[in-house]
């Protein structure tokens, strides 16, 4: 059996290159159209989302009106005061500079959470997923899971982040990109 990790479709924040973790955005029209072009040849027996609009809408666009459960532990990292802002908006902010030039896995954005904190909650939830589950979630969440499951690959967490609407099938100690 397998577990399927699928990143939500594009949102306005993705298109505008904004930090978006805790903001509950819908898919953009372009994101919905792109999902309509994807063809998944997978057969999950269970579906889980983070409960954010963008993940629930992605599930429906890809798999129709299937029953699913919500686990909020699979939500994206909380970017705190950097939420819904771009690099250009933040580049002169000393707190932002400290976050991006230091260890941004351990550093915490003001009113947000660190990558380490997010990874802990995500991996705790991931350990409970049964085989056959399709998890529709977020790029940072998928990247954290993949980095933890495949450390021998030597990739930084961000190198695992799939494109919107894409993801990975995990089967035992192997993986493949999907769709």
Predicted features, each with a name:
Residues 3-66:
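Active-site-proximal alpha-helix that buttresses catalytic centers in soluble enzyme cores
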Residues 3-4, 45, 131-140:
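Generic beta-sheet signal
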Residues 11, 141-142:
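Short active-site segment of divalent metal-dependent hydrolases/proteases
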Residues 26, 66-73, 153-162:
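Short hydrophobic/aromatic-enriched beta-strand-loop microsegments
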Residues 42-73, 96-98, 150, 171-179:
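Conserved histidine-centered catalytic loops in small-molecule metabolism enzymes
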Residues 49-50, 120, 136-137:
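Short beta-strand scaffold positions
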Residues 62-121:
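Phosphate-handling substructures
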Residues 152-178:
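Domain-level recognition of soluble alpha/beta enzyme cores
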């Amino acid at each position: 059996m397998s577990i399927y990790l699928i990143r939500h479709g594009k949102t306005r924040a993705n298109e505008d290159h904004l930090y978006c973790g805790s903001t509950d955005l819908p898919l953009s029209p372009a994101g919905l159209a792109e999902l309509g072009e994807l063809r998944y040849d997978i057969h999950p027996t269970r579906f889980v989302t983070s409960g954010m609009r963008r993940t629930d809408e992605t599930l429906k666009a890809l798999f129709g009106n299937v029953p699913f459960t919500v686990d909020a532990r699979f939500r994206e990292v909380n970017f705190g005061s950097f939420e819904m802002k771009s690099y250009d908006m933040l580049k002169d902010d000393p707190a932002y500079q400290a976050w991006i030039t230091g260890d941004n896995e351990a550093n915490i954005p003001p009113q947000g959470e660190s990558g380490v904190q997010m990874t802990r909650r995500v991996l705790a939830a991931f350990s409970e997923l049964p085989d056959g589950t399709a998890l529709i979630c977020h790029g940072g969440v998928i990247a954290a899971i993949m980095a933890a499951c495949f450390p021998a690959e030597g990739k930084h967490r961000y190198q695992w982040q799939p494109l919107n609407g894409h993801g990975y099938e995990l089967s035992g100690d192997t993986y493949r990109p999907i769709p």
